[in-house]
């Protein structure tokens, strides 16, 4: 009984802070527009060709799409906003070009970020 009382008192005293923390990471309702942009980014990523000498141009499309999605998730206060901002920063770095190996690693990193958002958003 004392344990239950202690838990209730703790929850009452920390009330607002706990609720705000939970709300920050609680999944938002499904947004088909946001998911559509994520699908489009995945399609663009599949078309990036690291064998081309100017593969940085392929990343410019990714950069524009991820910038749009980053702003959208930020304004919506979606829990995936930080991940999508990271994807945008990654595409900015990749659009500057580099070696073929750098491009291939960049594709893997971008795919992981896209997959993380997909897993978080699917089923909502």
Task: Identify the residue ranges that each predicted region occupies.
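Intrinsically disordered, glycine/charged-rich N-terminal periplasmic/extracytoplasmic linker segments
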Residues: 51-124
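Positively charged n-region of N-terminal signal peptides that target proteins for export
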Residues: 1-4
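Immediate post-signal-peptide N-terminus of mature secreted/exported proteins
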Residues: 19-51
């Amino acid at each position: 009984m004392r344990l239950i009382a202690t838990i209730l008192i703790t929850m009452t005293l920390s009330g607002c802070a706990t609720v705000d923390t939970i709300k920050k990471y609680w999944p938002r309702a499904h947004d088909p527009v946001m998911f559509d942009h994520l699908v489009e980014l995945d399609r663009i990523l599949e078309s990036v060709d690291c064998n081309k000498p100017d593969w940085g141009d392929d990343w410019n499309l990714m950069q524009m799409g991820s910038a749009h999605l980053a702003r959208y998730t930020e304004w919506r206060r979606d829990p995936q906003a930080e991940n999508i901002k990271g994807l945008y920063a990654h595409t900015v770095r990749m659009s500057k070009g580099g070696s073929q190996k750098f491009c291939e690693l960049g594709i893997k990193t971008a795919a992981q970020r896209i997959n993380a958002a997909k897993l978080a958003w699917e089923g909502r």
